[in-house]
Amino acid sequence: RLAELEQDTVMATWRTHHRAAYDHAVDMLLSPDVLNMVAADYENLGYVGETANKKLMYLAATSRIMADPLSVIIKSSSAAGKSKLVKATAELMPADQVEDLSRVSKKALFNMERDALSHKLVIVMEKAGADDADYSIRTLITEKTLTSRVTMMSADGPRSELRVVEGPVSYVTTTIDKVDEQLINRVLFLRVDESEAQTARIHEAQRAARTTQGLER
């Protein structure tokens, strides 16, 4: 009972210090219009248009807490906004639930701590940075875990040790190139809007951000 009271006190203190954020989160959870509210949050972060992609990205990122999360590859030409979409999505997630990487070597994921990736949003901003780790990424997405046998030295000499890295994860990356079929069959494939209308929306948002009102947001 004492532990329950202490937990209630901690939660009450948190709500007091984070009242606005707490109220906003509750409003979103109770709203039938929650996905449009999410899209509006993207707008507040400077990512305009792309309503469907914003909703899909948010759902994929939050699916990390589920048993079978979604993973995403975003494809577009260079400088079309795919990285901006990923960064905005990461900003809407708890910082400690995001593993944001520039490069992943062949054995890097196998050598992580057992729970380091469990139910995390794993981002590799450009797929080329993880080409060496394609096998481990595919396995983690599909099997929800990585296992390997490594040789460790002990006082009695070398011994074999089983290493386990547990998922599942929601994996997100971007590319301008053709995607390997073995990976594309495991992910949600999105294309960024490169239309003239979307370009105009971006330019308008950039101009608005330079106004006094935009700088005060």
Regions found by a protein language model. Name each.
Residues 1-4:
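Modules that initiate DNA replication and primer synthesis
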Residues 11-102:
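P-loop NTPase catalytic core of nucleic-acid-dependent motor ATPases
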Residues 19, 162-169, 176-217:
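Phosphate-sensing "switch" segment of ASCE/P-loop ATPases
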Residues 45, 111-112, 159-163, 175-179:
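A generic local secondary-structure boundary/capping motif
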Residues 67-72, 118-120, 168-169:
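Pre-Walker A (Motif I) flank of P-loop NTPase domains
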Residues 75-80, 87-133, 196:
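AAA+/P-loop NTPase substrate/partner-engagement loops
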Residues 103-108, 135-167, 211-214:
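Substrate-gripping "pore-loop 1 plus following alpha2 helix"
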Residues 119-149, 175-186:
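Conserved AAA+/SF3 P-loop NTPase catalytic/coupling segment centered on the Walker-B
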